[in-house]
């Protein structure tokens, strides 16, 4: 059966200044690494069985029928500095598919060759970042966190030059859309009100059909990002490059370049090698989200009839982000601690635990997972200094007693909110190093394990473990 994509391309019907129409650049000798057949089925995409043909498809050598390939343009603030034109420098969107349930998704090839937005880059991707995004985006989906997805990964049979000669690869990314804060900024900076209005109408129709106008879209984006960042922080996730061009209007996580998950808890933890001043540190993520959303609000101002009134309205809305985030974050923390009701002092109880983790070298994931078990006192084993936990445990147990929830119910609830397994940085690095040598078995094992992160499985105990000091990853790289 030939490959079939249920394309219905609405972004391609926007004015030409939104994108450049172009096809992916063919590669020499594509080879299939992985294809996500459950996701393909979810999207209503019919795929053949031939690995060779799938490799040609997902490398961009064959463009599927009904596609309308294009590279999108956008702008953005990168580490606070304004870039008036960015865009898809190495990605080509094949088009939009409409899934059997009516949901609409973009299908994009990353590493598809040079575009008009490549800015001196070669338009290609190397194997490491492709595997990292495949692993982490699929792990995030399994964790229940809004995210882009990975449909396929292929090698290209070509070498790309980075810090060394690296094997090339292409990732097929699926997203609710690729509309970014930076997309709005691009047209606002050019005072292109007609394009801004078209983008607003398109975004609302696609993501928030029940809201009205710029105010409604801003409100929806504020809530979506408050919920998203709280979920990130609930699994110790650090995005690492929260530029405005990496914030979606859909509320999905996008662009996994230097991302990482904390092992030992540190509020101001930074992994990204390019984040020299800690702008995007773990605890800074809510403040940066608010800053980015203020840029969205600014970009929407030209669409408001009364600019002065709009500035006042939007300022109040953005200033309200902190309260939205606190509500979402406190809800995440209560669930992680098994607290059913909302009571005064809950947030302080949670923050006290985090402080003790930081003081005592507690592994973020393992501490919460152990608290979810039948012997929560074993959470002390996940600390370098176990004694710091005992006073907190006493206070937590007293708080649990006030909810009067059966132990079995509490355990089940907490284990559904506290994963046993996350994609630990050192395990991802091991996968990449093996794959560069042609061994994809570790990649297959890790991706299989991460499909079910809330279940303890002895066969994956090594993947759950805190890294030894010699294994710990202290810095991550964009790799673009």
Swiss-Prot record:
Domain of life: Bacteria
Uppermost EC category: transferase
Pfam families in alphabetical order: SelO
Positions annotated to bind ATP: 87, 89-90, 110, 122-123, 173, 180, 255
Residues that hold Mg(2+) according to the record: 246, 255
Alphabetical UniProt keywords: ATP-binding, Magnesium, Manganese, Metal-binding, Nucleotide-binding, Nucleotidyltransferase, Transferase
Keyword Nucleotidyltransferase: yes
UniProt keyword Ribosomal protein present: no
Family: Belongs to the SELO family.
Job of this protein: Nucleotidyltransferase involved in the post-translational modification of proteins. It can catalyze the addition of adenosine monophosphate (AMP) or uridine monophosphate (UMP) to a protein, resulting in modifications known as AMPylation and UMPylation.
The protein's name: Protein nucleotidyltransferase YdiU
Name of encoding gene: ydiU
């Amino acid at each position: 059966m030939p490959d079939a994509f249920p394309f219905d391309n609405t972004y391609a019907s926007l004015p030409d200044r939104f994108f450049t129409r172009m096809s992916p650049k063919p590669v020499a000798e594509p080879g299939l690494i992985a294809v996500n057949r459950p996701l393909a089925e979810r999207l209503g995409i019919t795929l053949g069985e031939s690995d060779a043909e799938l490799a040609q498809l997902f490398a961009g050598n064959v463009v599927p029928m009904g596609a309308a390939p294009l590279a999108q343009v956008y702008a953005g603030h990168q580490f606070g500095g304004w870039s008036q034109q960015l865009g898809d420098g190495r990605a080509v969107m094949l088009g939009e598919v409409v899934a059997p349930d009516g949901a609409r998704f973009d299908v994009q090839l990353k590493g598809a060759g040079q575009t008009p937005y490549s800015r001196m880059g070669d338009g290609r991707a190397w194997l490491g970042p492709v595997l990292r995004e495949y692993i982490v985006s699929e792990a995030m989906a399994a964790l229940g966190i809004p995210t882009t997805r990975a449909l396929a990964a292929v090698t290209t049979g070509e070498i790309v030059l980075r810090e060394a000669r690296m094997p090339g690869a292409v990732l097929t990314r699926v997203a609710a859309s690729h509309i970014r804060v930076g997309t709005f900024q691009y047209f606002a900076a050019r005072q292109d009100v007609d394009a801004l209005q078209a983008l607003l109408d398109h975004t609302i129709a696609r993501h928030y059909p029940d809201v009205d106008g710029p105010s409604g879209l801003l409100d929806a984006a504020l809530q979506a990002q408050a919920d998203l960042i709280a979920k990130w922080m609930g699994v110790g996730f650090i995005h690492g490059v929260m530029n405005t061009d990496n914030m979606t209007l859909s509320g999905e996580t996008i662009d996994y370049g230097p991302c990482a998950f904390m092992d030992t808890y540190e509020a101001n933890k930074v992994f990204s090698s390019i984040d020299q001043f800690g702008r995007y540190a773990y605890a800074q993520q809510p403040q940066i989200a608010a800053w980015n959303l203020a840029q969205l609000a600014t970009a929407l101002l030209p669409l408001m009839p009364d600019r002065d009134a709009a500035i006042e309205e939007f300022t109040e809305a953005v200033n309200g982000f902190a309260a939205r985030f606190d509500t979402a974050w406190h809800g995440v923390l209560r669930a992680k601690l098994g607290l059913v009701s909302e009571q005064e002092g809950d947030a302080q109880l949670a923050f006290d635990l985090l402080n003790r983790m930081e003081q005592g070298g507690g592994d973020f994931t393992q501490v919460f997972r152990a608290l979810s078990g039948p012997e929560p006192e074993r959470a002390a084993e996940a600390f370098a200094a176990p004694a710091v936990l005992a006073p907190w445990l006493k206070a937590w147990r007293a708080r649990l007693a006030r909810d009067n929830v059966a132990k079995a119910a509490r355990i089940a609830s907490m284990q559904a909110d506290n994963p046993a397994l996350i994609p630990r940085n050192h395990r991802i690095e091991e996968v990449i190093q093996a794959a560069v040598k042609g061994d994809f078995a570790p990649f297959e094992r890790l991706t299989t394990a991460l499909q079910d992160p809330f279940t303890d499985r002895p066969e994956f105990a090594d993947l759950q473990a805190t890294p030894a000091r010699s294994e710990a990853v202290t810095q991550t790289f964009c790799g673009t």
